[in-house]
Amino acid sequence: MSIFFNKGITNNSFVALIAEHEGIIVGYGGLILRETPGDFNRDSYLEGDILNMYTVPKARRKGISTIILNQLINEAKTLGVSKLALHTSKDGEQLYRSVGFNKPLYPYFELKLDDKIL
C-alpha cells in the first residue's frame, strides 16, 4: 500500500495531513485525486476521495478530525476538485454530515472481481 501513496505524492494525486501534539501524531487524513470523464460541459472533471481519517482515542472529541477534514476540503477546492466522496463508519457519519457530505442520490453498487479485496 505504501507504494500507492508514494506514487500519489510523487505525481501530486495524494494529499496527506498529519496532526501532532507535543511531537506525537494524534490524527491524520488523506485526499486521493482522480480525473474522471466529462460531459457536455467539460472534457473531464477532477474528483477526490477522502480516506484514512483517524484520531487516536485519547485525542478524540477535540475537533482534530474536523480541522483535518476542513483543510482537506479547502485543498480540494484550491485544486479545482468538483466532487468529494468517502466511505465512513457509523461513528464518522456526524462529522461528515456536519461539513456538508450527504448520501448519494443514486445507490452505489460494486462488483468485486478480486477475492483478495476487502
Could you say what each language-model-derived stretch is?
Residues 1-16:
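Active-site rim helix/loop that mediates acceptor-substrate recognition in acyltransferases
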Residues 18, 24-33, 49, 54:
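Conserved beta-strand in the GNAT
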Residues 33-38, 85-87, 93, 97, ...:
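Conserved catalytic-core motifs of GNAT/GCN5-like acyltransferases
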Residues 40-45, 63, 87:
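Residues at secondary-structure transition points
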Residues 41-57, 109:
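Conserved acetyl-CoA binding element of GNAT-fold acetyltransferases
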Residues 59-71:
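Conserved acetyl-CoA pyrophosphate-binding loop and the N-cap/start of the following alpha-helix
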Residues 69, 76-88:
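Conserved GNAT acetyl-CoA-binding A-motif
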